[in-house]
Amino acid sequence: MKLSILEAAALTAASVVSAQDDLAYSPPYYPSPWADGHGEWSNAYKRAVDIVSQMTLTEKVNLTTGTGWELERCVGQTGSVPRLGIPSLCLQDSPLGIRMSDYNSAFPAGINVAATWDKKLAYQRGKAMGEEFSDKGIDVQLGPAAGPLGRSPDGGRNWEGFSPDPALTGVLFAETIKGIQDAGVIATAKHYILNEQEHFRQVGEAQGYGFNITETVSSNVDDKTMHELYLWPFADAVRAGVGAVMCSYNQINNSYGCQNSLTLNKLLKAELGFQGFVMSDWSAHHSGVGAALAGLDMSMPGDISFDSGTSFYGTNLTVGVLNGTIPQWRVDDMAVRIMAAYYKVGRDRLWTPPNFSSWTRDEYGFAHFFPSEGAYERVNEFVNVQRDHAQVIRRIGADSVVLLKNDGALPLTGQEKTVGILGEDAGSNPKGANGCSDRGCDKGTLAMAWGSGTANFPYLVTPEQAIQNEVLKGRGNVFAVTDNYDTQQIAAVASQSTVSLVFVNADAGEGFLNVDGNMGDRKNLTLWQNGEEVIKTVTEHCNNTVVVIHSVGPVLIDEWYAHPNVTGILWAGLPGQESGNAIADVLYGRVNPGGKTPFTWGKTRASYGDYLLTEPNNGNGAPQDNFNEGVFIDYRRFDKYNETPIYEFGHGLSYTTFELSGLQVQLINGSSYVPTTGQTSAAQAFGKVEDASSYLYPEGLKRISKFIYPWLNSTDLKASTGDPEYGEPNFEYIPEGATDGSPQPRLPASGGPGGNPGLYEDLFQVSVTITNTGKVAGDEVPQLYVSLGGPNEPKRVLRKFERLHIAPGQQKVWTTTLNRRDLANWDVVAQDWKITPYAKTIFVGTSSRKLPLAGRLPRVQ
């Protein structure tokens, strides 16, 4: 029996798959929907259609295909259409700043933005990043990320995203996208979808670690979980107008992410109404015709393997149209989607060529780095793009600090007689802030994790530097020990300190780097570099120990968090270049901590449920990672199994106190939901396709080695493609309906950006009064949770939140709304969102378990 996406996977992640018939299955969905320019895309779509109508076939293909790894200045670069003034598009990492560049800022990670619970700061960070990317001549930022969502706390790249809660992630994901695109740069929502672990994400990478597999991991999930958890933030991204989506390395129900017709054609383009373009993750492109028909619009970096000179697109895409296996309208739609995104963000007005090289810091070099060909020219212009962004970086760093525990130790007065700064995490990397490639080591303070989701630091203020400056202002003594294994000296300093500030960390990152035996994903949730022993030593010698944790997510603290000599605990995440200043702002009370933990702190790793899949379980085939927990991850799981966390999702203390009161609920719209009906328009072809002789390489063209071109070597299409299987019957690899350009039925849940417009109609207005009952100004985050009812639903789920600044003694009324999507469940039979007949109850408070206010909602449909 095959398990369709409409059914829950029935195999455990640890079990050995016995037969191919037992594998999860992703049903096909064709044809690939064509853009129609609805909503805010209208003007950009019209301009895109106009320009694409003037292009030849090979010019369109040039837009869809990267030129190859290390062939141009950016990590990804498309071909150009110089005849029409369309430049090569530069695509560059990362979600927290410009990777492989210089004179750029290193922003806090997405997980820190989540800890602020601040929509405005999410937007400001996005806008600041977009400005830097634009100033460097980058057209497409490869970020932000909502995949991984954070299914497992030990997932290597969770920190690149926001939170395991889809609502918190979705809001901040969307605000980040708006900020980036308001700066004139195309944002990329990634990694789509179910990219929840690093193990087995790429075959070559896994084989390099000694695993005998021939296909990447398959993330197997049921339809309800897909919609209510993992697809949720991507719907918010589409609704925000995101220009690009990056498909992921993993398979989804045993179909590769970049050729999965259900996730790309049905969910993203048909149901959510995505109007931009889908690009592959780097070398996540596995076929030509199959990927094109399944919805992949752009191949990155263009070559099949790095510097191979071969491509599934390029010449082969041209051949596919000429021999009829790929309809012209499909390639036209690819080009229209790319150009529509380009025009939508106003890139045509802001475009400048890249003024840096990803491959060298030398000022001069060859135009084409890998083959050392082309003009020898200035490749790095050393343009400083930082502006005043250090201010927002420091602000986010401070506002994302979560005060987990405070027994009166904080804030510090600045008059402490002796301050001990203890732990390697307080100091500098001996190799320098950028001493490890892609931050692939854990030395010194952890302000950024590792992998392609990184940026070079322009500088890094360490906690030791910043705190020493504070102590010197008060004429105190300050002693630091940053060797975690010198417990004798640590004890000596702790014993004479008025307050001991202990800095510890836990790192993770992308799977292409192995750091201390962690192949991207964390091996465990313990502290790194002997961190537990440092804390134990200090608490034995100092009765005023404050622990600061820089980490990629939760760590196990059960052994020491309740120790009476641990008087304060702060989580500071990955705060970027202003790390030391940000934590000093909080420690010394210039900033009243208002961060809330965006994940749950459990007592053991087992508290979180299913472990990562770290051993192959399907022979040498695709490892099968079954998401049997469904929607029950993080706090939802803790609630389901009545697990008591150490610190619950949404928890965070302040230097003041708040009180919530006066819950009011008002029905503002009782209209019924109307599923979308009708048909789309027919697919359109723009321009005409000539015979093969029109697409031969131009005479006199000096070809660059390994460069990916769109032209033909010969009018003999088989000779041009170089594919030994060329000429196989179409029915063997072209799915039924895949080339059909006739009007198609609209899905019930479709109809607008993010889905059916009725989902976003506000039904209820909710208001609450928040009073600052303390003596200092501070920030509070009222959080609204909904119980959807039903026997198999989470106890409650987050739906709304707002960060508010409130003066002492002041009251503020927070007003929010609940729309239909907030109250609905995914109906796997109707294939639509439905508000079930079960009672709906709302809860408002300051964490997922501190919810003093509650109210029952009237029934709506």
Swiss-Prot record:
GO terms for molecular function: beta-glucosidase activity. InterPro entries: Cellulose_deg_GH3 (IPR050288), Fn3-like (IPR026891), Glyco_hydro_3_AS (IPR019800), Glyco_hydro_3_C (IPR002772), Glyco_hydro_3_C_sf (IPR036881), Glyco_hydro_3_N (IPR001764), Glyco_hydro_3_N_sf (IPR036962), Glycoside_hydrolase_SF (IPR017853). Keywords: Carbohydrate metabolism, Cellulose degradation, Glycoprotein, Glycosidase, Hydrolase, Polysaccharide degradation, Secreted, Signal. The active site is at D281. It holds the Pfam family Fn3-like. Beta-glucosidases are one of a number of cellulolytic enzymes involved in the degradation of cellulosic biomass. Catalyzes the last step releasing glucose from the inhibitory cellobiose. This is Probable beta-glucosidase A.
